[in-house]
Amino acid sequence: MSSVMHYYPVHQAKVGSYSADPSEVKYSDLIYGHHHDVNPIGLPPNYNQMNSNPTTLNDHCSPQHVHQQHVSSDENLPSQPNHDSQRVKLKRSRTAFTSVQLVELENEFKSNMYLYRTRRIEIAQRLSLCERQVKIWFQNRRMKFKKDIQGHREPKSNAKLAQPQAEQSAHRGIVKRLMSYSQDPREGTAAAEKRPMMAVAPVNPKPDYQASQKMKTEASTNNGMCSSADLSEILEHLAQTTAAPQVSTATSSTGTSTNSASSSSSGHYSYNVDLVLQSIKQDLEAAAQAWSKSKSAPILATQSWHPSSQSQVPTSVHAAPSMNLSWGEPAAKSRKLSVNHMNPCVTSYNYPN
């Protein structure tokens, strides 16, 4: 009896070492016990500490077991290059088609870009190829065909975009020419003044009669040439330049031609081009009549070229304008076009000597 009583307290102490009561364990804790911190089945308290701290496992394990773990971890390291080498070996090499196979495939592609399976198998057997090789070749060939089509379409689209720009530049030039007729004539006076003037011959103190007669004939011919040249210059200036039209005329008293600047208007006016051309024609006719009636013989007799003075540099003389063209005047707007209007471009004037 005493022996039994002596054994019982030892048994009670062993049972008391468990911290949890089996009657209080829940069903969910039994299933998901490894996710909770609570010990569901009454394991020793040192069990959770061993799982949380892995270094304690090595302390309790034998040295032989630790050595086996290190060996197994070292054996796992060289296993990765083996997998990489296997992957490199599994990489498919590019198929090298022969010239005969390429010709047959190209002919088939021209006839039909898309193949159904029976036709693909037939071509593969005939060319000693796999069905997959024929399928991939047709896919690549279709992609190349689409790229070629897109490459041809891009230059056409660029050319279409360039055409409107050229048309716009042409329209701008037309608009500038039309706007030039309504601009202020004062803007063009500066350009007319910058034109080089004709040089006047120096006066010879000993006049020569033969030289004076020769100069008279040259002056008479120059008057006709200058008038026609001035008229063509005016028409060209109206059609091409963007500034207001200006007229240059020649004076017969000095035997040379000078430029005459037009009077500027007070503001911007828009006139009809035909009216402007008609006013130019009338002013030129009036100036031609005045030139024919002028007596330039006494003046020309006193002017001649001297042989010793040919090396001298001629001087430029700005003569006063011989006529006044009403470019911006309201009177030019009220003039009416005559029925028998002659084209000033082809009109020629013959002046008497």
From Swiss-Prot:
Coarse class of the protein's main subcellular location: nucleus
DNA-binding region: 90-149
Any Pfam family hit: Homeodomain
PROSITE patterns, per the entry: HOMEOBOX_1, HOMEOBOX_2
GO biological process: amnioserosa formation; compound eye development; positive regulation of transcription by RNA polymerase II; regulation of transcription by RNA polymerase II
Composition skew (Polar residues), residue ranges: 48-83, 210-223
Domain of life: Eukaryota
Residue ranges, annotated region (Disordered): 48-92, 148-170, 202-223, 242-267
Keyword DNA-binding: yes
Biased composition (Low complexity): 248-267
Subcellular location: Nucleus
Disulfide bond sites: none
Gene Ontology molecular-function annotations: DNA-binding transcription factor activity, RNA polymerase II-specific; RNA polymerase II cis-regulatory region sequence-specific DNA binding; sequence-specific DNA binding
Alphabetized UniProt keyword annotations: Developmental protein, DNA-binding, Homeobox, Nucleus, Transcription, Transcription regulation
Composition bias type Basic and acidic residues, residue spans: 148-157
Any single Gene Ontology cellular-component annotation: nucleus
InterPro entries according to UniProt: HD, HD_metazoa, Homeobox_CS, Homeodomain-like_sf
The UniProt record lists the keyword Transcription: yes
General function of this protein: Required for the differentiation of the dorsal-ventral pattern, and does not appear to be involved in the process of segmentation.
Name the record gives this protein: Protein zerknuellt 1
